[in-house]
Amino acid sequence: MAGMAAAAAALVAAKRCMNAACGAPAPSPAGGEWRKGWPLRSGGFAVLCDKCGLAYEQLVFCDIFHQKESGWRDCSFCGKRLHCGCIASKNSFDLLDSGGVQCVTCIKNSAVQSVPSPVVPKLFSSQNNQRLFGKSDDLLSGRPLETSSLMVDARNDDLTIIAKNNLPFMVKNVEAGQSSNILRQKELENGARQIKWELPTLSIGDMGRIPFLTRSQSALESRRDENKDPTTESTTSESLSEACLNMSLGIASNGNKLEATSTVERPMLSPTTGFPEGRELTTALSPFQHAQRARHFLTRPPRVGEGAVFDPTKDMLPHLRVARPPAEGRGRNQLLPRYWPRITDQELQQISGDSNSTIVPLFEKVLSASDAGRIGRLVLPKACAEAYFPPISQPEGRPLTIQDAKGKEWHFQFRFWPNNNSRMYVLEGVTPCIQSLQLQAGDTVTFSRIEPGGKLVMGFRKATNTVSLPDSQISAIANGSILGDTLFSSTNENLAIVSGYSGFLQSIKGAADLHTSSIYDHHVNSADGDVSWLKTDKFGSRPDEGSLQFLKRGRNIGSKSRRLSMDAEEAWELKLYWDEVQELLRPAPTAKPTVVMIEDYEIEEYDEPPVFAKRSIFTIRSTGEQDQWIQCDDCSKWRRLPLNVIVASKWTCADNTIDSKSCSCSAPEELTPKELHIVLQQYEDMRRRRNSFGFKQNIPEMDAVSLDAFATAAVYGDVGNQGSPSVATTTKHPRHRPGCTCIVCIQPPSGKGPKHNPACTCNVCMTVRRRFKTLMMRKKQRQSEREEAEASKKIAWMNRDEPEGSSLSRSPQTVDTTRDGDVTMFDKVDINKGHIDLNFHPTAVRDEERHGGQPRVSMVSLLEVANRPLENYMKQNGLTSLAGEQGSSSTCTGAATVPQPALVESEERTSNNDGGRVATAEQPESMAVDEAGDNQPDKAAGDSAAALA
């Protein structure tokens, strides 16, 4: 351990500062620590002492230790001395393509002050863009640029890209009478250089066409310096400044005349380097900053004069529909762009006729199915109705007279419906007008106003395939927040797909001295309305305001793609349905199936995966034998094979090892051309029926109407006249694709199409039969359960009443012998009058009466009789008092045990007060005796009280 510590101490002692001018040893623990220096070629970093490392971190290492060494150069922009031949200063400067050097401070300043331009055309590589001012040394030193480095191509008006001596420039032909925004370098008395921007007057003439659209940027014009010497102007050259062409699609005050203007601008400054108007540009930006800002250049378009009109577009775009902003009205700013009128000048002229009146387009609406139907009601957009139609306060509305394009007046009822705290405005009675104009769903109705007079006019436009500008882009154009690159890409794309002008852009490219984007630098005067590009940004506004919002809102994402509808039978034949694919899946030859029963269906299960077989046609002979027919891949002849043979996906006649006569392609075909035609035709008909209706048939069930009936045709004659029945078009419910085989799609409409055979075995019929069978079984089961429940209830009542009745009739009772002669009779209640007795059996009563027996009385009837008032009992029996019965009964002595007499049915004696018939039953003697024996004192008191009453 002592040896290792000594070695470590020796290593630390040998470690010194790598600065040759310093060479300090390892610092003491209290003196400081080592610092990292420049990266070494062998890896790692140089080891410096605290003093040298601090100088290296502050970028003054060479200024302190290498002042007398060679390799020093000045920064091309700030003039700082840089030690270019030292590894310690390797990361403190950068080399310019033109041969100069640039310090790291200038690099950082340029990165902070430069504003990224997302719409800069990718004309040059990033390396060239960063070194755009290749001759910055000449600019700073005051030497003019050599004219030999600018090569102007005078053969066309387009810009020519020059890259000479690693100096890319964009130069356009400068002709007589044409001026440009130039960058002038002027020398002051102290020898310093200033860069001033001037905005000379642009003359009207043949202007060069700029093939690029630039982003929106505000135009600022700086004043001339009064202290400048006009005689010190140096040679002028074309500047590479940022410029902009503010464009907006709009309509002028006169409604038709449009103009194109462009604004020449100076380089855009970051918010931190902005300066007020009149301040010298060099006080805010250094010469290096000017050079760095120039790499974010945008080509400056020329100003188009009043006489410069782009004539070819008149012929190329005669039917371009551009949405016009709506006229003045209540709430016009709330109108959606889809309601803006896209009416052309020709249509306006047709409406106005030869009169001097002015037609003001208001809005338009695409007719829906309900609008064009027989309801006679046209739903109006709420904002449009409130803005341009007369105000109404009652739901009944008011009559409204509107003139059509032919001059005929129509009378409608303009009203509204309250709807969720809002209103839905409608025009009622529009059916005659729509029928007269022969309008359908999808057509467009336009509403305009005739000035003076304010009369409403209704025009129309038939539905076509014309593609208009998207609503999002129209709204962005109207709001004025539009970018050049977005408009260039999206509008060009829309113009290229205008109906009837698909080759519009290609024709412009092929025209002489024209560029693709030149249509944006000139008027587009068409019959649909003039199109112009107007500047929208105000003086001094920031160019990036609202750009991000517009990029999100105005991005052209194309029209909404909808699901492709394939209704044609030819298109259906291109698809392989799942049942057709299953025909190609066959079990492996060595696989043995396991049969499983699921819902009365036998399903074969295999442990091995299926194999792909060749498509074949299965037939049934007149004898009942089944065959399959395979087509050879070489000779295209059809060969007969047994049903159980599995054919590979690629099969030839040489693979036929079963039939030796057909094992060669030279062997004749077994089918005649007529039979083959019948087989193939019926096979296609079967496939079409199966695809349309989900028709499924098992192979053993195919008959003469099936796809392969040539054997039957040979026995019964020609079956060519046996055409398949016509198949009606199915009514598919929504969200189901063509070829759907659900139970709704495969059935024909109600009352249409062929009827199914009662013995049909299709999927629908089998499903219906299975469901009907299940329903009938459930119905019978419920009925039997109900009958069993009723029978069990009856048996329970009978078992409960039977011991009670038998005890009354069979049990011996102790009776008083003195009352044998007096038998109290109760009326039997007629249970068929007003009540339903569940224990009443008419058949049993008839049987008892037939055999001389007496019917049995239930406990319910006895309880009802016992609950009757005593007065009714006395009236029914003709008794006025119970004293006589009581006295006579008292003379009888002794008691005897006698059987209870049976209950007998008595005749109807009296009727109650309300006229109802009442039947009575004779009371058993035991009950009377029981009451007399058990409660004799109480009954005597009760009888005496009744007698007194």
UniProtKB/Swiss-Prot annotation:
UniProt GO MF annotations: DNA binding; zinc ion binding
Annotated region of DNA binding: 363-464
Residue spans, zinc finger CW-type: 623-673
Record key words, sorted: DNA-binding, Metal-binding, Nucleus, Transcription, Transcription regulation, Zinc, Zinc-finger
Region of interest (Disordered), residue spans: 218-240, 777-820, 881-949
Record has Zinc as a keyword: yes
Pfam families: B3, zf-CW
Residues where Zn(2+) binds: C632, C635, C653, C665
SS bond list: none
SMART domains (UniProt xref): B3
Comp. bias (Polar residues): 806-816
Domain of life (superkingdom): Eukaryota
Compartment(s) of residence: Nucleus
Composition bias type Basic and acidic residues, residue spans: 221-231, 782-803
One CC-aspect GO term: nucleus
Protein name: B3 domain-containing protein Os07g0679700
Species of the source: Oryza sativa subsp. japonica
